[in-house]
Amino acid sequence: MSDLFTTIETPVIKYEQPLGLFINNEFVKGVEGKTFQVINPSNEKVITSVHEATEKDVDVAVAAARAAFEGPWRQVTPSERGILINKLADLMERDIDTLAAIESLDNGKAFTMAKVDLANSIGCLRYYAGWADKIHGQTIDTNPETLTYTRHEPVGVCGQIIPWNFPLLMWSWKIGPAVAAGNTVVLKTAEQTPLSALYAAKLIKEAGFPAGVINVISGFGRTAGAAISSHMDIDKVAFTGSTLVGRTILQAAAKSNLKKVTLELGGKSPNIVFDDADIDNAISWANFGIFFNHGQCCCAGSRILVQEGIYDKFVARFKERAQKNKVGNPFEQDTFQGPQVSQLQFDRIMEYINHGKKAGATVATGGDRHGNEGYFIQPTVFTDVTSDMKIAQEEIFGPVVTIQKFKDEAEAIKIGNSTDYGLAAAVHTKNVNTAIRVSNALKAGTVWINNYNMISYQAPFGGFKQSGLGRELGSYALENYTQIKTVHYRLGDALFA
């Protein structure tokens, strides 16, 4: 094998892993010859090393994307774009076990959950394949002697920076609408989880995309990510990640060429349970809402607010439910929670847990690492929490949840809106009027009623306040990747007097 590919064996499958930067439909080494290690979070061992993109590599990838956008990609019809995206989805479906195994390997998510992610990733691509030939403008009746119409044109070269918590799902969320709308892409993977996106990159060429349309590079935010954000020949940047980094990207975009920006950022989402809620249903969804994907979800229901009438009963039963979540080897069939993605993330979460203990909150269950190897953390439930505590205000991004008591609807809304974030929220109640009133009052981009974490690629997703700018998914995402041109065609012969 060359240093651009290696053979990796997982408990599920043995496969050939690309290691290079995918630029112009080829895997290549980085200009500076740098590589970095990819760690298995389940055992803390090195899986392999991949080539690292630096600023120079971003320049090469952007040049390839620009050449494709100005050249062959312009000649591909919208219907043909849709066919290509569908072909890519077909290839991902063919290799779904391989892709899911890769995500379990370098991300640590349960293999069964990874397959669900892949199904949604494939579905998302097919959804946008269907949109490719349905993007259109309108005619506007301004006066009898003028034909006025609008065109929705592609933005151009799009820089896309995806996170490590849902590598291929975010890959599809980004490239689906961008490519459907006729743009070209330079996508940077997270340095913790580059492997599945690199494998999927080889499917891009197999699907028949022209060279340069989709370029996939691996690298670090401080170098490759910064270069994308400030690049003068990138027309739009999309980022999913922390609010802190989102601010940096927005500043870089403004200081460079004022490129369009979409940001899907952090959250501290309230999951509100009223006295009249179906408590079994609420506990089930609240458990899924926080501990799914090891708590590494931007929209995780990390603050459970319970009305005082059922608070004690809820806490006791929720604690029991959390203790039933199996933490362990992501390749075992019944594993629900795998390891956190990295040592850095593990340490950060443990720091928050220790801070909560010192602040006076009570650990109802968990509060420590799980096992002696890997970045595993016990599902952790804090009670006796006040809204001013750090663990109730800041995004922890791990399997840690706070439970607070509220008296009435007004207090629930007040506590629910008491952070800087506004990505998501949930309301559990049997009263339709309560559900509608509270969902309307919550400052959140998505509100679930009597469920949690049910995101659909057909519906928009994004945040209020410091949880982001713009919307992913649904037809709304296409607005991020098109720009509107108005054309006034003079039909009459009269000269301007």
From Swiss-Prot:
E.C. number(s) listed in UniProt: 1.2.1.3
Keyword entries, A-Z: NAD, Oxidoreductase
InterPro entries: Ald_DH/histidinol_DH (IPR016161), Ald_DH_C (IPR016163), Ald_DH_CS_CYS (IPR016160), Ald_DH_CS_GLU (IPR029510), Ald_DH_N (IPR016162), Aldehyde_DH_dom (IPR015590)
Residues the entry annotates as binding NAD(+): 241-246
Residues that span the membrane, as ranges: none
Site (Transition state stabilizer): 165
Cellular component, GO annotation: extracellular region
Oxidoreductase among keywords: yes
Pathway: Alcohol metabolism; ethanol degradation; acetate from ethanol: step 2/2
PROSITE patterns in the cross-refs: ALDEHYDE_DEHYDR_CYS, ALDEHYDE_DEHYDR_GLU
Top-level class of the enzyme under EC nomenclature: oxidoreductase
Molecular-function GO terms, alphabetical: aldehyde dehydrogenase (NAD+) activity; aldehyde dehydrogenase [NAD(P)+] activity
GO terms of biological process kind: acetaldehyde catabolic process; acetate biosynthetic process; carbon catabolite activation of transcription; cellular response to osmotic stress; ethanol catabolic process; ethanol metabolic process; threonine catabolic process
Keyword Ubl conjugation: no
Residue positions of the active site: 264, 298
Catalysis performed (reactions): an aldehyde + NAD(+) + H2O = a carboxylate + NADH + 2 H(+)
Family in the record: Belongs to the aldehyde dehydrogenase family.
PANTHER family: ALDEHYDE DEHYDROGENASE-RELATED
This protein's name: Aldehyde dehydrogenase
Protein's organism: Emericella nidulans (strain FGSC A4 / ATCC 38163 / CBS 112.46 / NRRL 194 / M139)
Originating gene: aldA
